[in-house]
Amino acid sequence: MTTLAIDIGGTKLAAALIDNNLRISQRRELPTPASKTPDALREALKALVEPLRAEARQVAIASTGIIQEGMLLALNPHNLGGLLHFPLVQTLETIAGLPTLAVNDAQAAAWAEYHALPDDIRDMVFITVSTGVGGGVVCDGKLLTGKGGLAGHLGHTLADPHGPVCGCGRVGCVEAIASGRGMAAAARDDLAGCDAKTLFIRAGEGHQQARHLVSQSAQVIARMIADVKAITDCQCVVIGGSVGLAEGYLEQVRAFLMQEPEPYHVALSAARYRHDAGLLGAALLAQGDTL
């Protein structure tokens, strides 16, 4: 059965047709509407899926935020703008005229990456470091979503009790420091106003402050992974996201993790499906994989 998979992120929307063998075809992308209003997102989704819907039999959505009963919610409302309580499933069912499933994008990506691992891996954690920091947890071969959809929101664990205020309302969350947005917010002087991509470029050029911001992000993520290992005793951690997959970043995270006591060490790897993980994981779930 062909699935129309959609990935809704903070900066871009992606859609593709995915068959039962996880082959991706007709992949399309559009920028996420800058206004982040319900009408703008609805029109963008319509434009994105219209050329694809005739060949699909169902829709699977991987979206930023928390999905509760088909509605879009968020720990950090700033990530959604005016889209809080957006009726995601109902909107796509109306646009596509097809049965629709929606799941958090990091949870979906975790499920895809889990399927790419050897059969003897039953416990894994996926972490995405991008505009925000998210995650997904697979325990004994089952994806944890939680009754309220909150499971895996690792970016809202504590990194620094004296750190910046996070958009979720807590002080010193991992996301507020280690995410692309957090790094950009901390940039000063000649780096003020730079986005994360620019910070990585400047770090590669040897800019001291940029190198510090990237290193600080990697250290915060490494410490979070040590916490995750203590909580889940996972067999491996897979890292994705635009920051997580940036050149040299995973190596820095690995080096910082090795500074933690040995019981907190865990195998790290880059996401195999990279930026398609959310699409593939949502399709897998829609095609019959159970949570």
Swiss-Prot record:
SUPFAM superfamilies: Actin-like ATPase domain. It catalyses: an N-acyl-D-mannosamine + ATP = an N-acyl-D-mannosamine 6-phosphate + ADP + H(+). Pathway: Amino-sugar metabolism; N-acetylneuraminate degradation; D-fructose 6-phosphate from N-acetylneuraminate: step 2/5. GO terms for biological process: N-acetylneuraminate catabolic process. The keyword Zinc applies. InterPro entries: ATPase_NBD (IPR043129), ManNAc_kinase_bac (IPR023945), ROK (IPR000600), ROK_cs (IPR049874). Keywords: ATP-binding, Carbohydrate metabolism, Kinase, Metal-binding, Nucleotide-binding, Transferase, Zinc. PANTHER family: N-ACETYLMANNOSAMINE KINASE, ROK (REPRESSOR, ORF, KINASE) FAMILY. Belongs to the ROK (NagC/XylR) family. NanK subfamily. Homodimer. Catalyzes the phosphorylation of N-acetylmannosamine (ManNAc) to ManNAc-6-P. This is N-acetylmannosamine kinase. The gene is nanK.
